[in-house]
């Protein structure tokens, strides 16, 4: 499968490299999960999922919505995670930050890696998110 690239300034990064950079900036010493574009996700902008393979091993993955995150006709600025985003790249970054918080909590073996109080604390303290929901599309609780 070909790599999907994000343009950030003068460098072009894959989504996984972008996730790795966000994790490093947050000070989280964990490897990035696979991050994929999903053409079928039409209601939720991003989703963190953990699936079990045939051998019983759990695998985390972040899925991002092609229909929602590759739109170019949003009115700007767009509120994402309670923050004003002025371009599609900023929207993608906020969504990726949000999903990486779920991943971090899962990696830390938290019992609840959903929208818990710990999630809210990390969202605010690490990324400055004003809301624990994306604000684009709808999200499961």
Task: Indicate residue ranges for each PLM-predicted region.
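Walker B catalytic acidic pair
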Residues: 99
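Active-site-proximal or metal-binding-adjacent scaffold patches in catalytic folds
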Residues: 1-94, 103-141
